[in-house]
Amino acid sequence: MSYLSVGDEVLIRGELGIVRFAGSTDFESGIWLGVELLNGKGKNDGSVKGKRYFSCEKGKGIFVRACSSNVMKRPSVVKSRKKGSENISNFMEKTKAIKQKSRREPSKFERSLARPLCITPIDSSTPTKTATFYTSSTTENLDELNFSTEELSSFDTTLLNSDTSKLSGLDDSSFMEEEFVWQVDNVLQECEKKFTPHSKGSYLKENLKSELRKGRLDELMCENTALKEKIDKLNKELEKVEPQLTFLRSKNSIEKPRNFRREKFLKKFLAMQKEIKYLRKRKLQIRKIPNYKYSDRSLNSKTPKSQDNWTTQVTPSSLLGVSEVSKVLQLKQVQVDITELVKIPKNPFSEKLTISNVNRYLNIVPGSLDLQFSLTNENFVHWNSTVYQELLNLKSNNSSVDGVKTRRQLLEENALLSHKVLKLTEEIQDLETLNQLNTEIEARQSEKLNEVQEETQRLSQLLISSQPALTEVKHLKLCLSDSQEELLQLNAKLEKANIVIDELNSAKLKLSKQVEEESSMKDDLTEMNQRLKEQIESYENEVNSEITSRTLKEFETLKTQYEKNLCNLREQLKTARMKLADKYPQGDNTSENIDWLKHSLRDSNTENSIPSPLTFACKEIRKLVADIKPVSVEKQLALNWKKDIERPSFHHNQQLFNYCQLTDILSKKC
């Protein structure tokens, strides 16, 4: 496919791909296309037998012949709505014009093809009316005929090829449409989401298919109009060529009277040649007569007086010579008339001997030559009879009267005869030149007749061979008329589809406006959220900064108080220990003391049994736990201590242990 190039999107057996290479390869002859498949169902990565033609991922490249029917160019979608309506109006106008043309009468070209070609046979025996000669313009007409026949044959071949391609394109149109629908499926799905009914989606698919068919049919109709314009041009050319064909048909009738005239002319020419031969023989016979001796010197040496004596001594026989001289003068006048009519130079080969010149000469001569040759023939016969009578008279005079004829009389007769012979020789030369011209004309005309016959045969064969093509053209016209009706129906459907598409487009515009409004609302909400977050963060930062400053101050004050209280507690503990040691002196047996403490704590209430410094310390610890805010080990211990104190069944030994542990930690920090 010559219309594919690198970068085009292609469908190969229903799979989408991109052309990456186009040209000849080393692995096989011909033009190949290297295609990168998008689905990845190929055979290579753009290289074959170690040579790389293009680069792609492995398993996505494939090579396909450019002329294969599996490769199809991906069609383009017409998005503009206005262009579609304009195309429909143009298409309707074209279909109306095509219908009007198809309903017209058959052209002259069809009539000439329907009419059989009549070729008249050449018959030299039956003469016909005279016509104009075949001039040099016929060669130009024949060239035009050959050119027109070649155009007809080429036009027939182009018609057949274009029709087959159109039919194949129409067959493949449905395949193209089914492959192209997948491009629109995404748009249809979005529309179906917005316009929930399923019927609208299917209707849109049908509309898209009809749009595809419409674009395909637009191309076909444009091609059809171009072909019809070519047919009209060829019809006009055939109308121009028809007079030339009639001329060629009448050429046979033109040549018949020519042949008849030539035969008549040749007969006259042969008769004149016989007369000339006879005159030559008579001249020889006259020279053989006795006392027929003279010399040029004697003639040149004659004086005017002797000439006067010669003129005075006129005999009856010399009168006969005068009559002969008058006849010779008549013959000379006839010859002059013939040369004026024919207008051929004495040396015809000095000029260019062309068919046009000869035809001009022969067009002038035909009527007058017959009359002049008849006159010359009669004059020659009369002159021959007179010469014969004069010879008889001369013989009788020679026998009867001795010495009557002098040498001068014989010289006069000889001079007259020689003058006649010279004139006759000139006429013979002219006739020979005419004969040569006629022979050349006959040869050329025979050649042209053969050429014309061959061309007529070729034309008849071409007409016979073009008849099946014409029948096919008529059949295609019928098919086109059917397709035009289908196109009209499709146009009606397309108009309805355009109305529905307009409604859908209006709905799409409304939805797009709503979506834009929603998107603007979302943007406003996001901006508000961001502002609130920023305000909250700023407020939290301010609050945290205030809280931290307050807590630090309070912690410092509490710390100082706690340190004071700790010092007091230490002193009180020391005194309490001393008192306990004094009050309960039981040696170093601590386990017994602990058991005793447990027993005493169980039996008595906590507040009454615990000594006063201990209760004071518990209260202080509770206050500290309530005031301390930052999380630390001290806070955790204080919380545990608070929980233990709040329990009703709390053992004092554990309470004391926790208290001691807390005091140790605080003492270490202090």
UniProtKB/Swiss-Prot annotation:
Q: What is its main location?
A: cytoplasm
Q: Which residues carry this modification: Phosphoserine?
A: S460
Q: Which Pfam families match?
A: CAP_GLY
**Keyword terms:** Coiled coil, Cytoplasm, Cytoskeleton, Meiosis, Microtubule, Phosphoprotein
Q: Where in this chain does the entry annotate a coiled-coil region?
A: 209-254, 404-582
CAP-Gly domain: which residues? Answer: 23-65
Cysteines paired by S-S bonds: none
Q: Which domain of life is it from?
A: Eukaryota
Modification type Phosphothreonine: residues: T606
Compartments where found: Cytoplasm, Cytoskeleton, Spindle
GO BP annotation list: dynein-driven meiotic oscillatory nuclear movement; meiosis I; nuclear migration involved in conjugation with cellular fusion
Cellular component, GO annotation: cell cortex of cell tip; cell tip; cortical microtubule plus-end; cytoplasmic microtubule; dynactin complex; meiotic spindle pole body; microtubule associated complex; microtubule cytoskeleton
* Gene3D superfamilies (UniProt xref): CAP Gly-rich-like domain
Instruction: Name the job this protein performs.
Output: Binds to nuclear microtubules with the effect of either modifying their structure or function. This then promotes meiotic nuclear division.
Q: PANTHER family annotated for this entry? A: DYNACTIN 1-RELATED MICROTUBULE-BINDING (PTHR18916)
Could you identify this protein by its name?
A: Microtubule-associated protein ssm4
- Lineage, please? Eukaryota, Fungi, Dikarya, Ascomycota, Taphrinomycotina
Question: What would be the name of the gene that encodes this protein?
Answer: ssm4
